[in-house]
């Protein structure tokens, strides 16, 4: 088959872009011709349609008025007429651009509804679809319109219940909710990772650290998520701050890799920044807690291959998000053979934890204090004690990362994706 994977954007480091690339790799291996279709001209995007993405002024205009209240139109009717006009334009563009494809795989276009005209136009194509839903509009408060008519559009069409559409979700919570809300059946396809070989090596560990001018014996915690408030990165700062304080007596002791601990702990940000104000707050908070930050977000934005390279520099990975649809950076850490400190968000507990990973827990409850997310001090202290043991025990460190790598290979690999696609998804 000739297959189009379509999204607002592609070739970036967000979860949807990454999963599309994995689907493309697996589907191509299965013998299909696969193209990624998006608005932006990035490496990895095979067909560019400038009308479907964030940079299209109509996208921004529709999104602002649909979700934030009518501001740019005289009446609801005028705005709905504009929506219909854009739908017609997009229908003709899509009908022509996608005419030669046998299967269309929209990613989040029908589940978030960020550009309703696009979703409505897409549903009119006489094609076979596999709708890949990573997130749903009802999971995001800012995507639930106050306007009754607009809410009805989302309730009825996002996602559409059509005989030519098969639905895929990424976790069992979303599967149950889609069934409850719309009586739509779906297949759970977890996020996956290439576990054919580790993405790090001892040689690269030393080389990357040398390039970054990180002194030998420095402990590096890696925060690889995008910089966004939903990732609650302040918890990583709390972890690193307490870890450094706890390890005062360990200076010159042998780390898991044979190096002598220098007394320094660094928190490295490798994810692209999507909230400059939040990054500023994190820098101020880190300074107040005595935590050294190394922020390489801009460098990664310019060169995405650097993102993967930076896993080599880490001694452990922090993953403190309180809300995730799945957990790409968790799988990346496992593939990189790095221990993980994580907050037990709902999807982790329902879909990932049963696989049997070994991890350092920040619990599953949090609270806000002065605008920042916090966990109980006793849980934080226990987590730091566990990290300390890992970092200074070569056998425990090796056993933990090797165990997790095997779990990842068994449950969350490209081979697992191929199996689900062939048995449960493809027509």
UniProtKB/Swiss-Prot annotation:
Gene field: mggS
Temperature dependence comment: Optimum temperature is 60 degrees Celsius.
Keyword flag Cytoplasm: no
GO MF, any single term: glycosyltransferase activity
EC code: 2.4.1.-
Protein's UniProt name: Mannosylglucosylglycerate synthase
Pfam families xref list: Glycos_transf_1
pH effect summary: Optimum pH is 7.0.
Keywords assigned: Cobalt, Glycosyltransferase, Magnesium, Manganese, Nickel, Transferase
Organism: Thermotoga maritima (strain ATCC 43589 / DSM 3109 / JCM 10099 / NBRC 100826 / MSB8)
Function of the protein: Catalyzes the synthesis of mannosylglucosylglycerate (MGG) from glucosylglycerate (GG) and GDP-mannose.
Domain of life: Bacteria
Reaction(s) catalysed (UniProt annotation): (2R)-2-O-(alpha-D-glucopyranosyl)-glycerate + GDP-alpha-D-mannose = (2R)-2-O-[alpha-D-mannopyranosyl-(1->2)-alpha-D-glucopyranosyl]-glycerate + GDP + H(+)
Family: Belongs to the glycosyltransferase group 1 family.
Cofactors: Co(2+); Mg(2+); Mn(2+); Ni(2+)
InterPro entries on file: Glyco_trans_1, manno_glu_gly_synth
């Amino acid at each position: 088959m000739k297959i189009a994977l379509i999204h607002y954007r592609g070739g970036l480091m967000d979860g949807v872009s990454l999963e599309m690339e994995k689907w493309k790799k697996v589907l191509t291996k299965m013998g299909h011709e696969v193209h990624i279709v998006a608005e932006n001209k990035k490496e990895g995007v095979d067909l560019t349609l400038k009308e479907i993405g964030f940079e299209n002024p109509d996208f921004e205009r529709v999104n602002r008025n649909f979700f934030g209240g009518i501001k740019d139109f005289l009446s609801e009717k005028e705005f709905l007429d504009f929506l219909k006009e854009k739908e017609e334009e997009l229908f003709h563009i899509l009908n022509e651009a996608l005419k030669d494809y046998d299967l269309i795989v929209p990613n989040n276009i029908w589940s978030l509804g960020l550009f309703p005209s696009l979703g409505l136009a897409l549903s009119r194509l006489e094609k076979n679809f596999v709708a890949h839903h990573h997130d749903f509009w009802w999971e995001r408060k800012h995507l639930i319109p106050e306007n009754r008519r607009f809410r009805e559009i989302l309730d009825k069409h996002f996602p559409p219940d059509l005989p030519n559409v098969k639905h895929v979700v990424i976790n069992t919570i979303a599967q149950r909710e889609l069934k409850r809300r719309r009586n739509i059946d779906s297949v759970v396809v977890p996020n996956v990772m290439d576990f054919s070989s580790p993405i790090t090596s001892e040689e690269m560990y030393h080389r990357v650290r040398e390039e970054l001018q990180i002194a030998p014996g420095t402990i590096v915690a890696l925060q690889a998520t995008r910089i966004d408030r939903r990732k609650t990165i302040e918890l990583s700062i709390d972890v690193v701050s307490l870890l450094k304080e706890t390890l005062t007596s360990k200076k010159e002791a042998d780390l898991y890799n044979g190096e002598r601990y220098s007394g320094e702990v660094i928190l490295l940000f490798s994810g692209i920044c999507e909230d400059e104000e939040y990054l500023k707050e994190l820098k101020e908070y880190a300074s107040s807690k005595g935590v050294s930050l190394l922020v390489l977000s801009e460098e990664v934005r310019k060169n995405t291959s650097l993102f993967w390279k930076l896993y080599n520099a880490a001694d452990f990975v922090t993953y403190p998000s309180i809300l995730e649809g799945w957990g790409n950076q968790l799988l990346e850490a496992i593939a990189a053979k790095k221990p993980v400190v994580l907050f037990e968000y709902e999807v982790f507990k329902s879909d990932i934890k049963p696989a049997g990973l070994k991890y350092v827990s920040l619990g599953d409850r949090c609270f806000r204090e002065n605008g920042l997310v916090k966990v109980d001090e006793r849980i934080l202290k226990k987590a730091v004690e566990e990290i300390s043991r890992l970092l200074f025990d070569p056998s425990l460190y090796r056993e933990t990362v090797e165990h997790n790598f095997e779990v990842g290979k068994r449950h969350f690999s490209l081979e697992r994706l191929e199996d689900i696609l062939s048995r449960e998804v493809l027509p």
